[in-house]
């Protein structure tokens, strides 16, 4: 039987003792959320129900909505741009993986504190001798990023690879000196493909940004009460270390799913 960390139970119990005032105070009794569908351990499609998203971000929001007496649906809507469009339109209430920028501020109310930092880190071959104290030590070396990754840096020599697995194999063949990729995403992907033990992560990160919950301006559920409750609950959960615990649990969940044979139609 899988052991569940007692910290999670304690924190969720604390949340569930909050008064269930949602029906009396809020505008709605159901929240619909979405996000990028291919970003484990934060979010990915449920293999048992592909119309639904699962992952650490979904689990975190479920803990919050349960404590507020709200129903929650976390739906698959497509890739990052499609998910944002569905939230922007108000057809979906909440974006689970919003990063702060001017364009999104025009259509979303960001919840503070953030869910987690998204750290772009350098991954190198698991061998001694790579001297690294920061981003400047990568100058002049051959780097790889995954196609579609938003990271750019004019001071680094970066080529694109179709996916993280191919980038990592190029690294292991010494066709590149490092790969840049988000920390948790790389652990999930490489762990599921059996490549994680072949590489090592360099610290400090090359870049970092925050991932937030964000409520659509045009959502029927968007009101001061809900925004305030989301901020309060996020503050409590962050202080208790729950987001990090959920990330660890969902890394294992993703890896377990990858080890199972695919179902035949």
Segments (PLM) and residue ranges:
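N-terminal signal peptide c-region/cleavage motif recognized by signal peptidases
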Residues: 17-22
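Ligand-binding cleft/hinge of the Venus flytrap
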Residues: 44-48, 61-70, 113-115, 135-173, ...
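Flexible hinge/capping segments at coil-to-helix
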Residues: 124-143, 224
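A ligand-binding cleft/hinge motif common to bilobed small-molecule-binding domains
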Residues: 98-107, 178-208
């Amino acid at each position: 039987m899988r052991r569940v960390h007692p910290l999670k139970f304690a924190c969720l119990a604390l949340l569930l003792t909050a008064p269930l005032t949602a029906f009396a105070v809020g505008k709605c009794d159901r929240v619909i959320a979405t996000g990028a569908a291919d970003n484990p351990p934060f979010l990915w499609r449920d293999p048992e129900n592909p119309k639904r998203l699962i992952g650490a971000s979904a689990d975190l929001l479920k803990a919050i909505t349960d404590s507020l007496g709200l129903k929650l649906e976390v739906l698959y809507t497509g890739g990052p741009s499609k998910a944002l469009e569905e939230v922007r339109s108000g057809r979906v209430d909440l974006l689970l993986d919003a990063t702060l920028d001017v364009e999104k501020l025009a259509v979303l109310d960001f919840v503070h504190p953030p869910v987690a930092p998204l750290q772009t880190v350098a991954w190198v071959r698991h061998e001694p001798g790579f001297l690294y104290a920061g981003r400047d030590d990568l100058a002049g070396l051959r780097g790889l990023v995954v196609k579609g990754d938003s990271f750019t840096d004019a001071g680094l020599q970066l080529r694109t690879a179709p996916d993280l697995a191919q980038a990592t194999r190029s690294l292991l063949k010494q066709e590149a000196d490092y790969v840049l990729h988000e920390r948790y995403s790389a652990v999930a992907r490489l762990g599921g493909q059996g490549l994680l033990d072949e590489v090592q992560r360099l610290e400090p990160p090359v870049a970092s940004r925050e991932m937030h919950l964000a409520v659509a301006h045009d959502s029927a559920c968007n009101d001061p009460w809900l925004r305030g409750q989301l901020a309060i609950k996020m503050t409590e959960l962050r202080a208790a270390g729950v987001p990090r615990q959920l990330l660890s649990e969902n890394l294992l969940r993703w890896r377990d799913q990858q080890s199972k044979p695919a179902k035949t139609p």
